[in-house]
């Protein structure tokens, strides 16, 4: 083996136009070559790696409303059957004050149930990072620690930041009042309130326009995605089997047992799978189309605690022994 005492690396400087980069990130399908690019590459992940990407990020580009819209659309239709979420960064260059984020959000139509919006950026030392990249990592790590199940919220999890900041590195001081204002407008942020910097918020970007927990609460929404994706993969091997009563009962029984196991593990309040004859017409059955109905209630995250205090004079009587 040759010992190297010095290695010299040379490189060229490449200059790209922002619009060119944006176009590359959005990508598309090339009918001439049959190749995907940009966001369309999400559809190639499972085919090539047997991994379903359920979190989509584009740090540095997602604050563009066109990119954010494409991310949300792709998250809602991965390989035509799977579903996921897109984490979007609000603009930290023009939106410099927390109170202006809701207006930016609405003006740029970042209000979809499949979008998770965050503001501002964060620092580790002097390095500046987009919050979406950190939130994606937090969500993935939380899922792994939770048995590879997304029933826990990224809310109040370690952010690993030393400060919050704007794009130019200007520090942003985020107190509880400001953080809760952002949360109330469907924006996740960071907060250094008790202990260290934590991710703060459990709502998707559709909040407060929608208060449906399936749409607006991150872990509840992700559980619906995950259960749906898991059922598709689990019963994919049954495609081609005879569509008879035995098959229907087998799918309903085994999937309901799985839902029971999720309930026992604390991921669901409860769940079951049934076949409704009204939803499975004779025409569909003859065409080989089956529609199992999944009923489920994922466990909600704790969002707010309101302590109620009352003076109870009976303790005085008991203490004085009268």
Predicted regions span which residues?
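Surface-exposed interaction regions enriched in Ser/Thr/Asp/Glu
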Residues: 1-24
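Structured loops at beta-to-helix junctions and adjacent beta-edge loops in soluble globular domains
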Residues: 10, 59, 295-297
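A glycine- and small-residue-enriched flexible loop/hinge signal that marks low-structured segments
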Residues: 21-24, 29-235, 272, 276
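Conserved structured core elements
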Residues: 65-68, 249, 253, 288
């Amino acid at each position: 083996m040759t010992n190297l005492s010095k290695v010299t690396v040379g490189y060229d400087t490449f200059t790209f136009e922002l619009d060119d980069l944006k176009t590359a990130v959005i990508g598309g399908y090339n009918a001439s070559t049959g190749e995907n690019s940009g966001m369309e590459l999400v559809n190639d992940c499972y085919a090539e790696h047997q991994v379903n990407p359920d979190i989509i990020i584009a740090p540095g580009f997602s604050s563009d409303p066109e990119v954010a819209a494409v991310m949300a659309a792709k998250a809602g239709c991965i390989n035509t059957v799977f579903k996921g979420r897109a984490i979007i960064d609000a603009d930290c260059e023009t939106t410099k004050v927390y109170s202006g984020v809701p207006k930016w959000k609405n003006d740029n139509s970042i209000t979809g149930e499949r979008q998770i919006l965050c503001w501002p950026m964060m620092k580790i030392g002097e390095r500046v990072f987009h919050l979406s990249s950190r939130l994606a990592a937090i969500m993935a790590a939380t899922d792994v620690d939770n048995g590879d199940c997304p029933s826990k919220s990224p809310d109040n999890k370690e952010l690993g930041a030393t400060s919050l900041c704007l794009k130019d590195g200007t520090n942003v001081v985020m107190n509880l009042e400001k953080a809760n204002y952002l949360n109330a407008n469907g924006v996740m942020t960071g907060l250094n309130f008790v202990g260290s910097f934590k991710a703060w918020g459990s709502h998707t970007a559709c909040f407060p326009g929608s208060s449906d927990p399936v749409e607006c609460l991150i872990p509840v929404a992700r559980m619906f995605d995950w259960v749906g994706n898991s059922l598709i993969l689990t019963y994919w091997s049954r495609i081609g089997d005879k569509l008879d009563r035995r098959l229907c009962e087998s799918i309903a029984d085994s999937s309901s047992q799985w839902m029971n196991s999720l309930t026992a593990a604390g991921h669901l309040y409860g769940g079951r799978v049934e076949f409704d004859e009204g939803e499975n017409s004779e025409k569909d059955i003859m065409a080989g189309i089956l529609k199992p109905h999944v009923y489920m209630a994922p466990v909600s995250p704790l969002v707010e605690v309101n302590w109620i205090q009352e003076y109870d004079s009976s303790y005085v009587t008991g203490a004085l022994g009268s």
